[in-house]
A protein has these predicted regions:
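N-terminal helix-rich structural modules
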Residues: 1-194, 628
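Intrinsically disordered or highly flexible coil/loop and linker segments, enriched in small
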Residues: 35, 39, 43-50, 66-83, ...
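Active-site-proximal, well-structured secondary-structure segments within enzyme catalytic domains
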Residues: 133-134, 162-165, 172, 176-218, ...
Length: 679
């Protein structure tokens, strides 16, 4: 079978040979991968010898490598470079993959062997890493229904398969709604207030869509965000805002209202089947937070700390709007970004657009890579021999301080059809250390949706896009520095409420003058970014910080409201949502809008009962970065400690243990309040 997935890659560093993969290779490779893993599992269960760590736990850890190889590419490309044919394959294979996973996690003979090893764990003289793998394997089975009766196991399978199909449907509906919307502008008058970069991008989109002489605004962030921030046309802002915030609740085939209800109820049923009172308790048992009480404590503590300042922020924006528009002007959600931007300019004379010329993408990239070199001694070398999945993508070899090969890094910066919105880091190959001691190094990718270059201008980033770059690059470092024996605990395979610490700590550098001075130069003149402009960035950093915090808290409360339910939901999704986040809302709520139906993070992503983890990690990152502030932001000893104690360790120990080893104490919210100027 001449299928690239089913033979050695013969590429540099064993990288994915994207150019050899054809659409028709996926299905046979997935089916063969499932067959091979079934065989590997049968070898474990059919082993006549007494179960040991070696012949059961380790053998299970190594099973399924072929399947993992093909599904990794399939599901990564579904996000980064999809097409109808790929979506059809995913839709076709998802139920089979779900059933395959369930067959393993509900395999009684396999569980009996795992349990036999688990029950004698005290006498096995395992290393801490081996012990954690054993506990993780055992828990994985129990959490997937291995201790259930036959009847309940059948129910568990049914629920899992339904969830699997519905989450895929939820995502596809949202992607299609996003891609299906266009706001076509026909006159220059309709462009009033928009910066040149947004006008150029809209003209470029119109050209791509065959609408010459027009401008097209879409619901993708690089188009939507500047329009809401700068457009002088209130009615058009309202139109776009309503289009964005009513996605997936129209009377069409992409409506997700019913799917939200089904997803929430299925997850509750699944958790209760396993003996948990609700889905949040099931999730949080494997989180740093541990219980919903701790999550609510965090959300409520922050709500109490930030609300007074957030009210002042909104009042200040409302006052400016009334000064400009008249005393009876009512500030609506589609006005907020627009007047907030005006106030920001008035207070700090900081126009995001005026910053763009200093943040040309290739220089930002050099700055971010340079930061990693300065902190950790690693270097990046582009290598065009490494295959990529789209011409936009660049591939780099990353070398450690001693010159040894560390990782492959792919960068994919710009939006295109077939690529979902947002920004993310992913792996095409994770790190592990083989039984022969060979350290198999990772291949990681950072994917963004930055404003594209135009025919006259290179890609110029906003300051928030610079932040996004640093954030995703922090995840990439977590993946690249991975140094663990077992793939399932490597890199970003950590508790969800810990995974954002390595990414968010990097964002702190964005407002450090010493860092900005290393790369921020005007793309035409080469003039370094003026110091007073940097000072204004620093001053503006906390602008509207409390309002932004309440917005994140609103998503956290919404998430917890859906997943702490102990009875079936049969109500009105929109009304329930508005009730859930009522205490966080400082602007009029609109009847027709709905977040839940497009809230991929908590409905189809990995953040169900986990959205609080962004704030949790913010508390951690502020607390951790205070060490860098004390020792000097480029201090290599601090960086080495962060790498050794946190970035390289993956999920090999409880995150609080790792954190305290780096920090010397448990985190508090004080550093975050101080950073945000709340205290």
């Amino acid at each position: 079978m001449n299928n690239p997935f089913l033979q050695p890659y013969h590429t540099l560093h064993d990288t994915t040979p994207f150019q050899q993969i054809r659409i028709e290779d996926y299905e046979p490779a997935v089916r063969e991968g499932m067959r091979l893993e079934d065989e590997e599992i049968q070898q474990i269960t059919g082993n006549p010898e007494e179960p040991t760590f070696q012949n059961t736990i380790l053998a299970l850890e190594h099973a399924g490598k072929t399947l993992d190889r093909v599904t990794t590419v399939l599901f990564n490309l579904l996000s980064a470079e999809t097409c109808d044919a790929l979506e059809e394959i995913a839709e076709k294979l998802t139920p089979a993959l779900s059933e395959h996973t369930n067959n393993i996690s509900l395999n009684e003979q396999l569980f009996a062997r795992v349990k036999a090893v688990y029950d004698k764990r005290e006498s096995l003289q395992l290393t801490p890493e081996e012990r954690r793998l054993l506990e993780k394997s055992y828990d994985g089975f129990v959490r997937n229904g291995a201790n259930l009766s036959e009847e309940d196991k059948a129910t568990f399978r049914k629920l899992s398969m339904e969830l699997s199909s519905l989450t895929l449907k939820f995502s596809q509906n949202h992607l299609k709604e996003t891609n299906g919307y266009e706001l076509v502008l026909h006159t220059e008058d309709e462009l009033a207030g928009l910066p040149e970069s947004a006008i150029e991008a809209a003209a470029h989109t119109a050209h791509e869509k065959g609408k010459e002489g027009c401008w097209v605004i879409t619901l993708q962030a690089p188009s939507y965000v500047p329009f809401m921030k700068y457009s002088d046309k209130r009615e058009l802002r309202k139109t776009l805002y309503m289009a964005y915030n009513t996605q997936c609740c129209h009377d069409n085939e992409f409506n997700n209202l019913k799917i939200v209800e089904q997803l929430v109820n299925l997850r509750m049923e699944l958790a209760q089947l396993l003996g948990f009172k609700n889905y949040a308790e099931y999730v949080l048992k494997k989180r740093m937070a541990e219980h919903s009480e701790n999550v609510y404590k965090l959300l409520n503590d922050l709500l109490e700390a930030y609300t007074p300042t957030a009210r002042q922020e909104v009042e200040e924006i409302r006052a400016l709007a009334r000064e400009l528009e008249g005393e009876d002007f009512e500030l609506m959600p589609w006005d907020f970004s627009y007047y907030a931007e005006k106030l920001k300019n008035r207070k700090f004379s900081l126009d995001e657009e005026a910053l763009r010329p200093y943040f040309e993408l290739s220089r930002v990239k050099a700055g971010v890579f340079g930061l990693a070199t300065r902190l950790y001694g690693i270097t990046f070398k582009e290598n065009k021999e490494i295959p990529v999945y789209h011409p936009d993508v660049q591939a780099y070899e990353v070398f450690d301080r001693d010159g040894s090969f560390l990782a492959v890094l792919y960068t994919d910066f710009h939006p295109r059809e077939g690529k979902r919105s947002g920004a993310w880091m992913t792996s095409y190959k994770e790190q592990w250390i083989g039984d022969n001691g060979c350290n198999s190094r990772p291949h990681v990718s950072v994917t963004m949706n930055f404003t594209k270059p135009t025919k006259d201008k290179p890609a110029l980033l906003t300051f928030s896009e610079v932040n996004t770059f640093l954030h995703e690059f922090g995840h990439a470092l977590h993946g690249m520095f991975a140094n663990t024996r077992f793939q399932s605990m490597s890199g970003t395979n950590v508790y969800w409420d810990f995974v954002e610490l390595p990414s968010q700590i990097m964002e702190n550098f964005a407002i450090e003058k010493e860092f900005l001075n290393t790369f921020a130069c005007h793309y035409q003149t080469g003039e370094p970014i003026p110091q007073e402009l940097i000072q204004r960035i620093v001053d503006a950093f906390n602008f509207n910080v409390a309002y932004a915090c309440l917005r994140q808290l609103s998503f956290g409360f919404l998430d917890m409201a859906w997943y702490t339910r102990q009875s079936k939901f049969e109500g009105d999704v929109k009304a329930y949502e508005k009730e859930a986040w009522q205490r966080t809302q400082l602007l009029p709520q609109l009847e027709d809008t709905c977040m839940s139906v497009q809230f991929g993070h908590i409905m189809s992503g990995g953040y169900s009962a986990g959205y609080y983890s962004y704030k949790w990690a913010e508390v951690l990152d502020a607390d951790a970065f205070s060490v860098f502030k004390e020792t000097g932001i480029f201090n290599q000893d601090t960086a080495r400690s962060f790498r050794e104690n946190i970035l390289s360790k993956g999920g090999t120990e409880h995150p609080m243990t790792l954190y305290k080893r780096f920090r010397g104490q448990e985190p508090t919210i004080e550093a975050l309040l101080k950073r945000n100027g709340i205290k």
